[in-house]
């Protein structure tokens, strides 16, 4: 693949016009075959990995020929696998061809995405999820409204293929992609749907589709805004495989589809900040309510016009930061006023003015987290700790390590909040749940378990926050860190509990719109 990338940099035209011959490279299928076996070995028993899982390149070439000639309304790869796996919906050869298809399409996509990123000026991107919070602290207090928009992940297969045609000139190379997409659409669980829904599974192909779709949406959006506003200060671009990124847009022009894009609404010097984590963009706006309504209307019309899909109104919600709390990745966000006393002493008299500054105040959602812990059987619905019965078959060290990992993730993620009383309540629940689990395993009580294991029981677990607070700073910085928030930036993804809580919030918003 590195050789393909080097060739693409030297001659990108060759990459776009002659992708189809890559499907007949045996090295490509050897790579996809090994990758498929590595992934499937972790989810299948060893008895399923027999010698019949050897790849036949002749069979692969026959399948590619059938892809080009078959009717797209027929499910792909029917009766093609001589030894289908009972626990897999896709056949062995279809997965191998799917891996090879992803490898081929990643070549021009990576070159195009890198060139778009390198061509931007004064743009910043961050991979860590926690770099979003310093940005919110810096930008959100200067805004009065936010738009919480969710990127639609439902799109018709043919529209997705046509978007690929914008930057891939080799039309035959898109036939396998079209067949795979229609194959997924014709699956039993999607027969009643008119559009394809990209599933949230950890496969390379669907991860590539999601990255491409998000990159395409954002690149078209920002390029359209830059072309419309005629402003050189408006940067645009896309960041695939990033957790989020942010933009500051100084000028924006909104087009109305009702008048066939003839009427132009000019928004003079609005302050708009854009940040995205996962598939949830947040747009902070400082302006009147009319500006917020125009931006919300523009996002809905943009998705309809370019991707021919109807986006439900609840997918773009507006909130007033000065009045209501907004839900960001696992937090309640609000802007609170912080009064400061400034003493100015002159020769005649003393002035004591009061300065009021705005700052972001993230609140830990304790009640939803307790509800999620109750779902995972760490406590009941009222927050009373219970034993984790499914872990009683593990060793004591494994039980302690698992509880320690849960608390470490929670403390790491929510350590930026001013009020940590809720965090210590979560710590208490996990601590007693750990002790009750060990007591249930040894058929004793918490007092007996603590007496047998001694004080090392709670020193080994739930002690990581001491390491986080005692950072290698100076004494003054260490004292200041006890009063200020510390955003830990070594978490690669959103906490699963925070992600689940965000889904619950989305369901509540949908129910409000349904009513």
Swiss-Prot record:
Q: Which GO terms describe its molecular function?
A: RNA binding
State the compartments where it is located: Plastid, Chloroplast
Q: Name one GO cellular component term.
A: chloroplast
Principal location: plastid
One Gene Ontology term of the biological-process aspect is: tRNA processing
Tell me which UniProt keywords the record has, alphabetically.
Chloroplast, mRNA processing, Plastid, RNA-binding, tRNA processing
InterPro entries cross-referenced by the UniProt entry: Domain_X, Maturase_MatK, Maturase_MatK_N
Family stated for the protein in its record: Belongs to the intron maturase 2 family. MatK subfamily.
Role played: Usually encoded in the trnK tRNA gene intron. Probably assists in splicing its own and other chloroplast group II introns.
What PANTHER family does the database record attribute to this sequence?
MATURASE K (PTHR34811:SF1)
Q: What is this protein called?
A: Maturase K
List the source organism. Answer: Pinus densiflora
């Amino acid at each position: 693949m590195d050789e393909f990338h080097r060739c693409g940099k030297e001659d990108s035209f060759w990459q776009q016009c002659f992708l189809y011959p890559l499907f007949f490279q045996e090295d490509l299928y050897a790579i996809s075959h090994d990758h498929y076996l590595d992934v499937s070995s972790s989810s299948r028993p060893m008895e399923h990995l027999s010698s019949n899982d050897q790849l036949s390149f002749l069979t692969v070439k026959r399948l590619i020929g059938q892809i080009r000639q078959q009717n797209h309304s027929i499910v792909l790869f029917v009766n093609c696998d001589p030894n289908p796996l009972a626990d897999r919906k896709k056949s062995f050869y279809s997965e191998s061809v799917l891996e090879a298809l992803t490898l081929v399409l990643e070549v021009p996509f990576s070159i195009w995405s890198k060139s778009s990123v390198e061509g931007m000026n004064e743009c910043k991107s961050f991979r860590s999820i926690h770099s979003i919070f310093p940005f919110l602290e810096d930008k959100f207090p200067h805004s009065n409204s936010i738009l919480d928009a969710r990127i639609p992940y439902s799109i018709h297969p043919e529209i997705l293929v046509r978007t690929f045609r914008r930057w891939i000139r080799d039309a035959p190379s898109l036939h396998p992609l079209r067949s795979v997409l229609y194959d997924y659409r014709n699956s039993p669980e999607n027969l009643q749907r008119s559009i394809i829904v990209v599933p949230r599974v950890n496969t390379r192909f669907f991860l590539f589709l999601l990255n491409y779709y998000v990159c395409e949406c954002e690149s078209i959006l920002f390029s359209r805004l830059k072309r419309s506003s005629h402003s050189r200060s408006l940067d645009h671009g896309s960041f695939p495989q990033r957790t989020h990124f942010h933009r500051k847009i100084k000028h924006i022009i909104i087009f109305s589809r009702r008048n066939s894009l003839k009427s132009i609404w000019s928004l003079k010097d609005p302050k708009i900040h854009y940040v995205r984590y996962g598939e949830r963009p947040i747009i902070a706006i400082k302006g009147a309510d009319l500006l917020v309504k125009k931006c919300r209307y523009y996002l809905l019309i943009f998705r309809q016009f370019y991707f021919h899909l109807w986006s439900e109104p609840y997918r773009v919600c507006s909130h007033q930061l000065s009045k209501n709390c907004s839900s960001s990745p696992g937090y309640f966000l609000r802007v609170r006023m912080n009064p400061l006393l400034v003493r100015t002493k002159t020769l005649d008299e003393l002035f004591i003015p009061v300065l009021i500054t705005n700052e972001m105040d993230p609140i830990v959602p304790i009640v939803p987290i307790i509800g999620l812990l109750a779902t995972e059987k760490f406590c009941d619905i009222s927050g009373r700790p219970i034993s984790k019965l499914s872990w009683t078959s593990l060793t004591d060290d494994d039980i302690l390590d698992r509880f320690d990992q849960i608390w470490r993730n929670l403390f790491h993620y929510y350590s930026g909040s001013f009020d940590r009383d809720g965090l210590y309540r979560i710590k208490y629940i996990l601590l007693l749940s750990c002790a009750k689990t060990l007591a249930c395993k040894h058929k004793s009580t918490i007092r007996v378990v603590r007496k047998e294991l001694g004080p090392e029981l709670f020193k080994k677990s739930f002690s990581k926050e001491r390491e986080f607070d005692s950072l290698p700073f100076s004494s003054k910085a260490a004292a200041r860190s006890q009063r200020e928030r510390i955003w830990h930036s070594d978490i690669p993804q959103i906490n699963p509990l925070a992600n689940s809580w965000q889904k619950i919030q989305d369901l509540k918003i949908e129910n409000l719109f349904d009513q």
